[in-house]
Amino acid sequence: MTFACSIPIRVTSELPTDLGGIPLSVEVDFGRAIRDAGLQGVFDPNSITVVNVVSGRVNPHARTEDFAYADAGRVEWVIQNPAHRDYEIRFQTAARRPPLLPQDFVPAIGNGDLLRYNAGTPRPIPLCYAMRLVDLTGDGKPDLVGCWNYYHRPGSPVSGVVCYPRVGDDFTFGDLMRLRYVERTGSREFQHFPGIYVEADFADFNGDGRVDIVFAESRKQEVTFYLNSGECDPGGQPIFVKDATIPAPVGLVSGLCAVDLDGDGVLDLVVNGHFVRNENPCGWPFMPSAPVDLGIGKRLTFIDMDGDGRLDALGLPAEGCGQALTWRRNLGGLAFGPEEPVDGGLPGDCTLVAASSDGDRRGVLVQHNAFQNVSFYELAGCAGGRPRLERQGLAQSLSAVVCLSDQAWPCACDWDGDGVMDLLVGGGYGWPRIVLNRGSNARPAYEPPELILSEGAPIRILRDELLFSEHWHNMGYSYPVFVDWDGDGLGDLMLPNETNRIVWYRNIGTPTHPQFGPRRFLGVEGYPDSPERRAASGRLATADNPYPKDDGVPFFWRTGAAFADWNGDGLMDFITHDETRKATLFAQYRDGGGRLRLRKQGHVRLVDGREIDDAIVGRAKHWTESFRAVDWDGDGLMDLIYSLAATGRIYLLRNVGSAQTPVFDLPREFRCFGQPTGFTIHGPNPWAGDWDGDGKPDLLGCVEWSVYPFFCHAALEMDRPPACQVSAMTWRMI
């Protein structure tokens, strides 16, 4: 017996008419509504629709992550017309709660929700550290589990142990959800796994046939076991109970593997490349021996590659991007042979590997493409002593969140001249990329990211290459902007970055097919530069101070720039920090021969006369800032968006001067419906502009692993969210 149910929603607060679309987020306990009505059956979370009662049309909506764990959560949509106040949330009951399926389209709401591909076809999903395929829900389908790192959607827990539930027969999955634990059996006080840099593995440690978790938090010399209780939360996810903690040689991002390495029938651990034997012949509780360094690396996984019955070791030669997967033959005991290559067309840029089985197919999960992708490779044989792996699937989801590796700061632009906004991003590992929108501005549909070429080769910006150095912090961290720098009518690629130089690539293509010439450095009058001078900057940086004072260079390290015509002469300028870490206007002009030149025009100031640095907002740690230009208030003057790492705060500095001489108002911290928006430590370096097409500028932020929280104009200007009245449910049998 199935019931069609409807819950009326009426917006009761006055709504502004001049702020564009307004997010509405309504918390509903569907399970309680069904119980209170005395209906048979349970809530079907996949059946939700939202109807605008005034227009009679279905409103696109989003569901919060809460529905992965319970029958209560938030349903979110955008009020496009403030005069439309009446809505209905419609849904159906089911005999049993079905698995939560991904939505085929999730609209941008604007209250910190995350940008999604919305391509109508599955797109890649990522994991940060640790990964396995295990059947957590008992439906016979291996789910993709592992760890997240740092922040995700604003307001959600940091890092943690996560799962993408399997939703089909192919290698496709649902939305990311978090695994939770309780302190004692029977408790329902759910907790999230602690820490920022964390490791986990998944196996049946106590022999009850259920998947348990072993977990490590970096810098703690211990691991903790969390046993699967056999009970589930209302969403059908297993409840884990915190159990024993044992000493282990944990290191920062070091690897944690549960494996019977010595073949005695019970699970051991390999932690940070050290073998920790389980001396309990019954397997549980785990009785650790003293750790033994295997001497073959840290991030290890084990699988019988050559069919001799012994578990061989797989790993990577070093940390970071650009590594090829290798294996070492098990020679018996704890001895392993030299590194050997693995056949099978594996990507050459692996960053993590984990032995896993997908049903009856044995193989490995491989993380690749600068941490962005996870693929399953099946072990397909071992001809001539050389094991071969065959790729069987790329982990994807129909509702995948756009996630583009380390600190890929965003810039929306019309890259290919088709009238719709694409997404240009930077990247911590040096590669700027373009994410093309094959949909419309009203309903974007994004392609996977593409590398950007210069003279036929992918553009990559790294500290050591620019500064001829060998520094431990050899990163890129570009803050890309696509803007017509040289006045020829074509957008050029501007790349402030990790260093105290700004590089750019001139567009030598067309408005619809951008192509880029060789790398150039922005030169400023009075600041001569050369390879020798750049090498001198590289030598200034020390291990403890990667961003030193460098008086001979006009720009500061790792700072984004606000490109606009700041002095009203029709030429492109920019504001960024100079070598003294003060916001400075760098202006272009034409010399007597008509050639474009760049000069340091001077520090810009607040209306009270102060120069602009992080002292105006009281930040204590001085690293990583960015500026963006946007006419936030629609008065025709370009304002300044200022964001800072460490706090993750974003500020508006209104231009209260003129188009020729900008002067900025005191900083106003952006808040989402009155609440602070600090949602990252290393960012957010937001892009500012009209993202949702309502004619009002918005903010698109970014977190460490480059998911993109979206804040619309109305949410940033209103002191509180719209109030609404949730009325009693009605229903009918169908």
Where is each model-derived feature located?
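Blade-edge motifs of beta-propeller repeat domains
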Residues: 102-125, 165-195, 227-251, 277-296, ...
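Solenoidal tandem-repeat scaffolds enriched in leucines and small polar residues
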Residues: 218-221, 244, 248-261, 265-276, ...
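Acidic/hydrophobic-patterned starts of short beta strands in beta-sheet-rich repeat architectures
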Residues: 138-148, 207-217, 263-272, 307-316, ...
